[in-house]
């Protein structure tokens, strides 16, 4: 009986570890998607860059996107 319980728990642990690994592989944020300011989660070769929005000289908040590393946007 102890062997069956141990085997069941070991199998459950292995299945849980496989599931967590599969979730981590596809968890990156794609290009152009909104991200957070912690700079984590963007897919490889992308960085989370944040820009402040202004309307009529009043700041309306900050928005962050996953974009190519080293690219900056400016209003001309």
Curated annotation (Swiss-Prot):
GO terms for cellular component: extracellular region. The keyword Coiled coil does not apply. It comes from the Eukaryota. Residues 1-22 form the signal peptide. Contains 4 disulfide bonds. Expressed by the venom gland. Coiled coil: none annotated. Keywords: Disulfide bond, Secreted, Signal, Toxin. Residues 23-26 form a propeptide. One of its GO terms (molecular function) is toxin activity. The keyword ATP-binding does not apply. It is found in: Secreted. Its main location: secreted. Belongs to the neurotoxin 19 (CSTX) family. 07 (U7-Lctx) subfamily. This is U7-lycotoxin-Ls1b. It comes from Lycosa singoriensis (Wolf spider).
